[in-house]
Amino acid sequence: MRCAIRTGVLSLAAVLSISAPLCAQNDLDQRINREADSLLATYKYLHENPELSTQERETSTLLAADLKKSGYEVTDHFGQYTEPGLNAYGVVAVLRNGPGPAVYVRTDMDALPIIENTGLPYASHVKVARAGGGEVGVMHACGHDLHMTVFLGTARMLGQLKDRWSGTVVLIGQPAEETVGGAQAMLRAGLFTRFPKPDYVLALHDTSAVPAGKVSWHAGPLLAGADSVDITVRGYGGHGAAPQAGKYPIVIASEIVVALQTIVSREMDPQLPTVVTVGSFH
């Protein structure tokens, strides 16, 4: 994990053009190494204390405090959901450093409703109430703990090396990425009007497809956009010997699941990456 953190910070710092000369590269390496223990401890804490989408209160507080220490102007609790009763936990941190482009660096913050069984000494044991009763485990199973750690490491490097770059950096802590509502909430609250409009936006995502210590990059969109829909099928059952007397929602819903798969196979250009997934059926 130390290697992944170091590689992520180094890659973002390099993209932000603070490490071009060899001497600067060596200095950057040394600075990252000095921060490694602190960043690893932060990673373990974030992994052990995950929060679900729209519930990222402690996570956003940690990010905001660390960014303030690095010299950023921080706005927290940023965002506006359309659903009543939801608090916004977006974080926006600005570091102005003379003339030049405005560059956004973004991380996601939320975890997933999954019970962790990794056996790690810093494994999550967090459980929260499930809608409808019972409890559900919470785990950083998609790497957002790593993303946030790299994000904070990059912020520290930019704050320490202001003599090597010019412009404005805006760091974005995005809530509710897993439920795809957090970005819209931040835009709705005026992200591009209250803060410098970006000339460039940078983000990263961990992947097991690339060996540790290496970085894969792509200009433009790389991973899929996402949207979601809930479908409710209403009906009623009946006696198994008299199926004509019922309107069976399970049968109808099963037909819907199969029909949805034809959207990709028959409605979409096969050269475009598209997927339709039914993630829950109950």
What are these regions (language model features)?
Residues 1-5:
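N-terminal secretory signal peptides that target proteins for export/translocation
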Residues 8-20:
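Bacterial N-terminal signal peptides
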Residues 15, 97, 150, 188-189, ...:
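Residue-level recognition of conserved structural "scaffold" positions that shape functional pockets
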Residues 18-22, 29, 43, 183, ...:
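A generic alpha-helix preference that emphasizes hydrophobic side chains
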Residues 25-140, 149-166:
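Acidic/His- and Gly-rich active-site-bordering loop/insert found
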Residues 90, 127-139, 145-146, 158, ...:
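Histidine/acidic-residue-rich, glycine-tolerant segments that coordinate divalent metal ions
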